[in-house]
Amino acid sequence: MNGLMIAAPSSGSGKTTVTLGLMRALRRRGLSIAPGKAGPDYIDPAFHTAASGKPCFNYDPWAMRPELLLANAAAAAEDGSVLIMEAMMGLFDGAADGTGAPADLAAALGLAVILVVDCARLSHSVAALVGGYARHRDDVRVAGVILNRVGSDRHEGMLRDALAGIAMPVFGVLRQDAALKLPERHLGLVQAGEHGSLEAFIDHAAMRVASGCDLEAVLAAATPLTVGERAGTLKPLGQRTAVARDVAFAFCYEHLLSGWRGQGAEVTFFSPLADEAPDPRADAVYLPGGYPELHAEQLSNASNFRAAMHKAAGGGARVFGECGGYMVLGEGLVAADGGRYEMLGLLPLVTSFAERKRHLGYRRVTPVDDVFFRGPMTAHEFHYATIVSEGAAEPLFTVRDAAGLDLGRAGLRRRNVAGSFMHLIDFSE
């Protein structure tokens, strides 16, 4: 299978919209698109799945072992004719030490790069910008550009003339279009499941990409993908794991679910927002992250969900929550307006969005004991909640940031119930 990376000089350049339009346009031509997302982001993959019709794997060169990156590519190759990978941030932006950039991923997987350039405030300077990106690393090939937010025919002509001077192919030109802007909130884009006209948006993006880009040239730029054998992932929480899944609990990595199934575990889903109970046969329940703060009142009134979670925990099932799921396992959640909502009360924890503080970055976590996990792991943390109070319970992890700074202990465990703000990704070497 061949692959491409859709990257940009910076965030906000329009690469998500271009990626969605490209996936849908190529899918309409009969191609089987394998979607991918660089980095730890949960939100973009749901849009990719909507555009491509296929599950989207994350590829994170900082947090994932090289063998897992190659294994994810192999899994994608089994069910796709071309991999379309969306980068994160700028092409060469990574963790604090510079590692883990999309460029590292392009080099590791052999992906040609198409650079999406926001040209709203550029003309001839585009050549210096693109030329610098093309020459920055010998092991990363910028195959061409898509010029986004171009204002007029005259503007397009200046841009094309400038890029002709450095022999950089222009695969497409997209004019400024207010209808091609996705709504955002504090953790990124508004989720795909909450976008009231998502299909219409993707169809419009596909129409603009198909009419403004040379799709044959885009496909011709794709390069053979470097793949590997299957790699081990984090162990499943249980033999039969019930996973919360709705707009309040949507942040769950596809490589983990796929890895759990590959290890023989059964995965079922339920919706706390619909007041559903986890599978009563489950020996583990997983509450992933999401936006419980936006649905706190509804969750506090979900009596069937609450009773079933207490029954599962009381019956010995391993219950684990990450970030938003961790907050729901606590006793209460204080919303941004100061109103408090009662949560499950399975952990002695009260969290608040009334006192906001951003927590963001890669983490290396080591379990304090082996009740839930063994060995060091990589993780990512991104939230605005603060801990108002914390009662007596065992700590779950010791934590270091990407630079190795000791962040102390984090998370809580009370018998067979545990959680933390960290989104676990892979084993740490």
Swiss-Prot record:
Which UniProt keywords are listed?
ATP-binding, Cobalamin biosynthesis, Glutamine amidotransferase, Ligase, Magnesium, Nucleotide-binding
**What's its top-level EC category?**
ligase
Occurrences of domain GATase cobBQ-type (ranges): 240-429
| Coiled-coil blocks | none
Chloroplast: is it a keyword of this entry?
no
Needs which cofactor?
Mg(2+)
Q: What is its EC number?
A: 6.3.5.9
What Gene Ontology molecular function terms does this protein carry? ATP binding; cobyrinic acid a,c-diamide synthase activity; hydrogenobyrinic acid a,c-diamide synthase (glutamine-hydrolysing) activity
Q: Location of site Increases nucleophilicity of active site Cys? A: 423
Instruction: Print the domain comment field.
Output: Comprises of two domains. The C-terminal domain contains the binding site for glutamine and catalyzes the hydrolysis of this substrate to glutamate and ammonia. The N-terminal domain is anticipated to bind ATP and hydrogenobyrinate and catalyzes the ultimate synthesis of the diamide product. The ammonia produced via the glutaminase domain is probably translocated to the adjacent domain via a molecular tunnel, where it reacts with an activated intermediate.
Q: What job does this protein perform?
A: Catalyzes the ATP-dependent amidation of the two carboxylate groups at positions a and c of hydrogenobyrinate, using either L-glutamine or ammonia as the nitrogen source.
Identification of the protein by name? Hydrogenobyrinate a,c-diamide synthase
Instruction: Give the species.
Output: Rhizobium meliloti (strain 1021)
Gene (name only):
cobB
